[in-house]
Amino acid sequence: AQPPEYDLAFVLRADERIMWPLEAKVLETPGAVAAYAHDVENEFLKCRYAPFSSSGAMVAYLISGAATDALSSIATRLGCELHEVVGHSARPNRYSKHTRCVPPGKTYPSSFDCYHLVLEYPGLTRSRVSTR
């Protein structure tokens, strides 16, 4: 089995096993959250990402649409409430609370908070690569 590869992780110097990972996904539209939700459910909540940490983060790069709509779609797809981050409610970020499926024999934290940040890129046009 290959170790997980996060997009970005902050590592605790005292114990390199402990890291706070961030996973990033491009969202073409606010409703295109399947891959985003897949990483939350299958990487973070199954302890593949951040097994020794009680939190992690997802970053969404939204190509078109509103961040508030993307956050709403994420909440619906994950089947949970997204809470405002105290002191930062005007920003397009929220967090969700989960109970993880900890593998038998492991002492990983079962309670997990996932932070969600949506960055809007209005008017961005993505280039398409020709396969000719």
Task: Tell where the protein language model's regions lie, with residue ranges.
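Active-site metal-binding core of divalent-cation-utilizing nuclease and nuclease-like domains
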Residues: 1-16
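C-terminal tail/extension regions appended to the core domain(s) of diverse proteins
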Residues: 30-34, 47-55, 68-132
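Well-ordered, non-membrane alpha-helical segments in soluble/globular domains
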Residues: 37-43
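Short beta-alpha junction loops
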Residues: 60-66
